[in-house]
Amino acid sequence: VGEVTTILRGSNFGDLILALLLRLSLVATATLSYAQSADYDEEGDLAILASNENARMHYQRLTSPLRSKSALWQGLESVIEAMPNDSDDYRRLETLVLEKSAAQLQSQVSQGTLSYEEITRFFIARIHAVETDDERYLNAIISLNPLAVDAARAADDERKAGKAVPPDSLFGLPILLKDNVGFEGLPTTAGAAALAVNYTRDAFVPGRLKANGVIILGKANLSEWAYFFCTGCPSGYSALGGQTLNPYGRFAFNTGGSSAGSG
């Protein structure tokens, strides 16, 4: 606080902003750790990418330089431990949930085959399984909502109490927000170190989604600042989320546009 007060008294506004951004970056850098396994060979993956005919995929790094991916799972450890990806429960839900439309999921919930809580738990387990796998990770997610399972359970309770849910509704289903959209439960960072702890109120759209029972599962990675400050930077890279990779070919295709984590 003393440092900031000194800056306020002795600097113009531009210098103040620059100094504060620098301090935030230094704080973030102090938490440096690796996102993947201890023996993950990032240099080997970068060498493969260097041979791609698309020069924009000649990345300089893949993992976030500022924080470990382990931060994603904080508050969700019990959910992940309860559903390892080699468990019968995971395989059962994979068949019922993966690549199903909202209408198909709602149909299964109405039949009692699935619950909203199970759907949300499965997607958390699925994200963990993919993002901790050195050969499959996508860096698609910046943050996960530790209260998502509670919200899904509440949606189940509403449905059991007689709530009418249209067959194509998103009620009770988990979605991700791009991380430049405000959501009260998670920081809205735009992928930037300067906004790493930027907690805001709900923006209009998330507020309406929540009011209609949609589960905010987390925030998707994006080109930092939604590609607003840079025209030659790698598409899909952010300091907090790392380099987003394309699920249809991690080393074959770019993740075009600023909404790279949405995949």
Which residue ranges define each predicted feature?
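Short, well-ordered alpha-helical
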Residues: S37-T189, A193-L195, W225-Y227
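Bacterial N-terminal signal peptides
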Residues: D15-T31
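Generic anion/oxyanion-binding catalytic loop in active/binding sites
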Residues: L22-L24, E94, Q108, N254
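Short glycine/serine-rich loop/turn segments
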Residues: D133, S169-G263
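N-terminal secretory signal peptides that target proteins for export/translocation
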Residues: V1-L16
